[in-house]
Amino acid sequence: MSKIAKILAREIIDSRGNPTVEVEAHLEGGFIGLAAAPSGASTGSREALELRDGNPARFLGKGVLKAVEAVNGSIAQALLGKDAKDQQHIDQLMIDLDGTENKSHFGANAILAVSLAVAKAGAASKGMPLYEHIAELHGTPGQFSMPLPMMNIINGGEHADNNIDIQEFMIQPVGAKSFKEAVRMGSEVFHHLAKVLKSKNLSTAVGDEGGYAPNLESNAAALETMKEAVEKAGYVLGKDITFAMDCAASEFYNKETNRYELKGEGKTFTSEEFTHFLENLTQKYPIISIEDGLDESDWEGFKYQTQVLGDKIQLVGDDLFVTNTQILKEGIQKKIANSILIKFNQIGSLTETLAAIKMAQEAGYTAIISHRSGETEDATIADLAVGTSAGQIKTGSMSRSDRVAKYNQLIRIEEALGERALFNGLKEVKGQS
């Protein structure tokens, strides 16, 4: 009933108009799983490799026909007749077949899409929702929690065509009593932010992740604008709503000068100076989480940043750790950061993703489930967040259906879980419980 009968891949389009890989996994019992791989814009140098065709005559070189061919050929052949419920075996087969350190032979986009499609088919064969199947794979059967959303309402950096250097300015509806209420609060602030921007004759065009992308005089001006929107929505800043930022500092780090260059403000900083720049912002605004506050290779700088800020706020490693247990283990040993961002496609399989979440949780680090800037309607990360009780999720703003699909799936899951739907809000954030 749960043996794989057919694997079928195709090229589809993501939210940035680029091709990505979608896979159907068909089981003997008639069960089907459908999944698509996301794609990032600001990527860590140690991420698993996304396989692109490189043919400039087609999709500007970004086609994924090679990855599709790998799935429909070698991968499909290897998986036929295998049990879809044995996720670890399926993923290991693909990793071994690929044979490279960074999945560059088949592409992480190919392997991940198969991995997720098989997981969905496996869940269907067990007659259970995906989040329940994931909880079992994670070794925590029957344990679920709803994540606190980190909503990216002002986009900058690589996610927008504006002059803001910091990539994401987020709100967290920590005063909510349920996930559905958190979504409502976020939506209301989002709409009030549009009014605030319009009143200042600023753009309300949106970036890759559905947040507004105005030109502002400084990064602090983004926080000030958000503060105004929160207050106009009738919420108390710091009590009902808190702030979070993703600096994506590797994107404005000059490796030749070892300086962080905020070109939008005309300022440059050393590692220590940039840490204190961020510290100053946390003293002015209720920022309780900062992601990639320094360059991914600046481990000495991160050590200092963790010493300065790590007891007060959540310091999240994204490009720093790239969902990789080997790198995370080193970070834990060296006391660098206190949280990891979890992105399926940075590592390239569900099994390896679950291993990174487990390692973080066992070390007392938080694990934040995240989308990528290039997304599809696939909402698997919603089930991942609930099934691993990760406690936090980043899936963009309150616009663009590729973002909203994840919020809507979480609303459905919360409804299905009923009284079992725990929502811990602020307690899920490192340093805030």
Curated annotation (Swiss-Prot):
An annotated GO BP: glycolytic process
Active-site residue list: 209, 343
Entry EC number(s): 4.2.1.11
Cofactor needs: Mg(2+)
GO cellular component labels: cell surface; extracellular region; phosphopyruvate hydratase complex
Keyword line: Cytoplasm, Glycolysis, Lyase, Magnesium, Metal-binding, Secreted
Gene Ontology MF term list: magnesium ion binding; phosphopyruvate hydratase activity
Cofactor note: Binds a second Mg(2+) ion via substrate during catalysis.
Thylakoid listed as a keyword: no
Record-listed Mg(2+) binding positions: 246, 291, 318
Catalytic activity from the UniProt record: (2R)-2-phosphoglycerate = phosphoenolpyruvate + H2O
Annotated compartments: Cytoplasm; Secreted; Cell surface
Pathway(s) served: Carbohydrate degradation; glycolysis; pyruvate from D-glyceraldehyde 3-phosphate: step 4/5
Classification via Pfam families: Enolase_C, Enolase_N
Residues annotated to bind (2R)-2-phosphoglycerate: 167, 343, 372-373, 394
Cited NCBIfam families: eno
Reported function: Catalyzes the reversible conversion of 2-phosphoglycerate (2-PG) into phosphoenolpyruvate (PEP). It is essential for the degradation of carbohydrates via glycolysis.
Subunit structure: Component of the RNA degradosome, a multiprotein complex involved in RNA processing and mRNA degradation.
Similarity comment text for this entry: Belongs to the enolase family.
Name recorded for this polypeptide: Enolase
Organism: Hamiltonella defensa subsp. Acyrthosiphon pisum (strain 5AT)
Gene name, Swiss-Prot/TrEMBL: eno
